[in-house]
């Protein structure tokens, strides 16, 4: 989601000290963040994107959640005010979860099947595609079924020894609990055409009956199997098929089967918006067109379930379990009242009472005449004008009849979903699934601040607590902290996407807010106005408290006064995302500047010099590090290699060594240099954090620390004052490691 809100906080006084005493990674949170982009939910809790939920068929306290990049979690007290979640898959090779379902043929409901997929709203970034994950002990342990490795698993069904998976390559089926799979799509005997198979639906009452949507190729449509997926028959009619083939085809199709055998289908068109919802009483023709839910905003402008046009990722559907006429649909975000009207401004409330860009969900009643079928499931359609986070991903009905919904903010519950009397509650509890793409440490007050995908910019409320507070909502920017100039005060910079509402705040050592300014970014010396990147890299200066570098879309800008005024110093564009390849200032030289643009390395020696290109790396530069006491020592990483220079970046030697061959870390993401008698270079990747020493030529690598899940570590920061390594992960929030420089910080493997 790309909408936002700025929040003014009453900041709490800190408790002193936040230092780990061993080589164990420590999770800081968020778990959850407060003041997020939800409405009339206690504390306005958000945690991060959850792609799939599985509700226990008979026990409303048991709920599983598959986070987009945070692994599988389980709660045994889902009906509590603050459910307690347990992480289950941290040691697996990927935490990118696409789907999870119970096996209805297991009478004890101990068997679950899940699949890996990359579905992050951050460009679908994610970890390895391992295949399927299966548990037979209520999630306590999981087996990786690798026969479908490297496939996006978009739907799963477990029926004893029979496993069925809908993937980007079609439908696969196993009859031996996943040891081997057969591709059914495109095989004449199966009845399924070749093409991407999106979603897989069934019902516990008739476990042998399955439905799948084929969403690419020439045979798009809805197909039904009555023999647990062995053979399939097209059941969609000409109208439904035509919709799925309209334009460039459906971007997404979701299915849900009710207890009476009724089937609902939701189709997203090639514009990323819900194009149609259909119902069949028994899974065969005829299919009744239920239209699409809409609200009327200013000047009669109509908006459906996807004002943001993000239906390719954000769509959910669930049939009601007791009323065969009811269906629930989730889209992306609320529209503001004047959206689509030139010059109207983006103001709330909208027509249903939404005051923010929160969740957009509806209830459909097929027994009603056209024009009366759809009712909001949020705001005016609730008893308390509540709404979950935007960008819905999955739905399930729990054993008590509540609607459980997952989205880019976490997991939420709608009580009494069949009426307007209920409301939305947070089930996030201590779930930690925040996707940080930027992170910074404040050594003065011992706080972390991070920019996250869709849950905004958040910061630690108090050391020792997992609760964070939202600074701004929407998509977080690249936060940075200046904490070197003083031991009693610090300055934090933060924004939302496109450097929106860049904020400069100063804090004392007790985390008390002492100033609050929106810098003007006024161009000087004939510089053009700054044009931000979606994710705009920032860098504070190592040697000067008020200097700032901004990596804009139209060049590199320098500020000498904290962003009040800016000067363009280069037209090159700093590479955005991941490690932010920019170093600004070294010991005794505030004018030093080094940055990466594509595969090219640019440098300014000091304030008297100009920016020039000095080298080209083998691929796009992901991150840079410099020994600030000796600027001739420079490090650079690409996605697959590590490089070392001893002449200030003019020439590099590859020091990747055994990092890739021994540890298979996946894509390299970020790095940090740690000075000392035997300096360390630390590199973060899709799977783990690794370290090499100067005494070994920075080319012999080891795993750093223990206890870190196999999550994408998106950004690293080393704080020399606290001797602390901070890791921002894409799916598990913020982590720290105290660097004691003892031998126990090195591990030979993951724990």
Language-model region placement:
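Bacterial N-terminal signal peptides that target proteins for export
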Residues: 1-7
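Sec/Tat signal peptide C-region and signal peptidase I cleavage site
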Residues: 16-20
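Beta-propeller blade termini and top-face loops
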Residues: 21-741
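Ser/Thr-rich, Pro/Gly/Ala-heavy low-complexity intrinsically disordered linkers and tails
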Residues: 747-750
